[in-house]
């Protein structure tokens, strides 16, 4: 006799008995206690929730560094882009004071701006 499993599948009695035996084998063994199983489940959950985001962040960070290095080496964007020149405000203010002081007379403090 056959039993209908799905829309297109049918399983004979022998195959269904084999499935039942396999299900019994996959159930809890007498050697493992529920505490051990719950501990293993908890560790697996923690590894997914804590380890994978860390690895994702590492890949994103190294990808950003790699992309920046490629852009710099192949000059895909102009090196004189002001986005590459990041200086502290104190250095900018000191450069502006140096330009406006009367002792400079034509000296340019462009390396700070």
From Swiss-Prot:
One Pfam entry name: TOM13
GO BP terms in the entry: mitochondrial outer membrane translocase complex assembly; protein insertion into mitochondrial outer membrane
GO CC annotation: MIM complex; mitochondrial outer membrane
Entry-linked InterPro entries: OMP_MIM1/TOM13_mt
Consequences of knocking out this gene: Leads to reduced levels of TOM complex but retains the respiratory chain.
Record localization: Mitochondrion outer membrane
Membrane-spanning residues: 39-62
Superkingdom of this protein's organism: Eukaryota
This protein's UniProt keywords: Membrane, Mitochondrion, Mitochondrion outer membrane, Protein transport, Transmembrane, Transmembrane helix, Transport
Family classification: Belongs to the MIM1 family.
Summary of the function given for this chain in its UniProt record: Component of the MIM complex required for mitochondrial outer membrane protein import. The MIM complex cooperates with the receptor TOM70 in binding of precursor proteins and promotes their insertion and assembly into the outer membrane. Involved in import of the subset of proteins with multiple alpha-helical transmembrane segments, including UGO1. Required for the assembly of the TOM (translocase of outer membrane) receptor complex, which is responsible for the recognition and translocation of cytosolically synthesized mitochondrial preproteins.
The protein's assembly and partners: Component of the MIM complex containing at least MIM1 and MIM2. Interacts with MIM2; interaction is direct. Interacts with TOM70.
UniProt-recorded name of the protein: Mitochondrial import protein 1
Source organism: Saccharomyces cerevisiae (strain ATCC 204508 / S288c) (Baker's yeast)
